[in-house]
């Protein structure tokens, strides 16, 4: 009886218990493949924020913009150029075996957070045309990246005053007696002006060079680019201590100071450096401007009509700092070479080896544009002072008559 009473008081047992299952979550409408999360809390947080930014802000670059060109045909040799602060700036060199004092050595300055390997095909082309070539990565990028970018200090100023200067000195030292030329892409045209050794440059060529003042962006892209580069990018830099740009498909991961250099750009380049943590003293900011005036090499600035960064206003804003260089500003539209688009990056794609690259090669060899060069010259160098005086005198005589 007692046993029956106990059984009668016991709670009824379930005949069947459904196993628990995790809810299935589908990612619908994602324009990009899901990002694999890191096995850490910080990594998961970064991936979640980056994925959310890419999907909701629609701020990833077009896929064909940042694809690396085909692998290089010639194996370059790695080199290290120690900067003035001791940082090892790393890159690759194409060197001819037979020494020749008259052979030029061309230094290639990269765009912001674009690896130097992106320019390998163009470097191999210049090498095949008789030039020695050096390509390198700025500190924090590619071959010059430290183990961790979180807390790593680097700005555009460091890339110019330290890294570019170190490579120019390395070129002069290891290629003694050879003329030094520079090809500069995007911000590479800025860091050239900041390098104290820029007086050694014989000729300079820039492609889409500017310092990213947002009002100069192409009108149809301006608001989107403002949100991406001047709002989202500094926010990511503040959260993570650097910009995890590679996971977003933008570019290489970027040091915080570089992101601030970019996002704080003002009409005057030096005015981006008035607030911490990238603040420069008033004397140092005046020195920045003076450094650009040391470059006396003739410069060809190439701008592409469909480059949302390199508008006429943006390129001219930077060229205004090179007051002692004879500057030629050439504008090229895609239809003038029979293609649909070129944009900010594609100049260095090997598909333009027969159309755009000969323009660069001709300028580096002769310092002049060939008569058949496509495009429109927006600005030509001013007449030399003696010729200008003679012209003014002749016009004065004509007016007197």
Predicted regions and their residues:
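N-terminal cap/lid segment of alpha/beta-hydrolase-fold proteins
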Residues: 67-93
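Active-site glycine-rich loops that stabilize anionic/oxyanionic intermediates
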Residues: 111-114
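Conserved alpha/beta-hydrolase
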Residues: 116-118, 123-147
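Alpha/beta-hydrolase active-site loop
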Residues: 153-173
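Alpha/beta-hydrolase-fold enzymes
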Residues: 183, 187-275
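Short beta-strand/loop motif that positions the catalytic acidic residue
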Residues: 295, 301-303
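Short alpha-helix in the alpha/beta-hydrolase fold that links the catalytic acid
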Residues: 297, 311-321
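Catalytic active-site module of serine/aspartate enzymes centered on a nucleophile-bearing elbow/loop
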Residues: 333-392, 396-397, 401
């Amino acid at each position: 009886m007692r046993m029956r009473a106990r059984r009668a008081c016991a709670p009824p047992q379930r005949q069947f218990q459904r196993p628990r299952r995790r809810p299935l979550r589908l990612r619908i409408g994602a324009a990009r493949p899901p990002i694999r999360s890191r096995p850490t809390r910080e990594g998961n947080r970064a991936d979640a924020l980056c994925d959310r930014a890419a999907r909701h802000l629609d701020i990833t670059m077009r896929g064909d913009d940042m694809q690396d060109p085909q692998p290089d045909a010639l194996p370059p040799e790695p080199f290290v150029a120690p900067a003035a602060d001791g940082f090892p700036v790393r890159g690759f060199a194409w060197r001819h075996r037979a020494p020749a004092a008259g052979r030029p050595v061309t230094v290639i300055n990269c765009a912001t957070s674009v690896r130097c390997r992106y320019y390998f095909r163009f470097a191999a082309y210049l090498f095949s045309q008789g030039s020695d070539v050096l390509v390198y990565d700025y500190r924090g990028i590619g071959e010059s990246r430290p183990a961790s970018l979180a807390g790593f200090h680097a700005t555009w100023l460091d890339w110019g005053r330290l890294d570019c200067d170190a490579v120019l000195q390395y070129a002069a030292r290891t290629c003694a007696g050879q003329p030094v030329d520079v090809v500069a892409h995007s911000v590479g045209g800025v860091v050239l002006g900041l390098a104290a050794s820029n007086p050694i440059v014989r000729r300079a060529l820039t492609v889409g060079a500017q310092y990213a003042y947002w009002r100069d962006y192409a009108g149809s892209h301006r608001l989107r680019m403002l949100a991406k580069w001047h709002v989202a990018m500094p926010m990511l830099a503040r959260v993570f201590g650097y910009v995890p740009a590679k996971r977003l498909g933008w570019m290489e991961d970027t040091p915080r100071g570089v992101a601030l250099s970019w996002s704080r750009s003002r009409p005057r380049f030096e005015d981006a450096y008035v607030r911490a943590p990238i603040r420069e003293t008033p004397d140092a900011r005046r020195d920045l401007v003076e450094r650009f005036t040391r470059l006396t090499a003739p410069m060809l600035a190439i701008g592409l009509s469909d480059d949302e960064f390199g508008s006429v206003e943006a390129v001219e804003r930077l060229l205004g700092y090179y007051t002692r260089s004879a500057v030629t500003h050439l504008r090229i539209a895609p239809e003038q070479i029979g293609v649909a688009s070129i944009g900010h990056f594609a100049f260095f794609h090997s598909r333009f080896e027969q159309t755009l690259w000969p323009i660069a090669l001709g300028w580096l060899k002769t310092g002049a544009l060939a008569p058949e060069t496509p495009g429109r010259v927006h600005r030509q160098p001013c007449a030399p002072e003696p010729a200008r005086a003679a012209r003014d005198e002749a016009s004065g005589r004509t007016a007197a008559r």
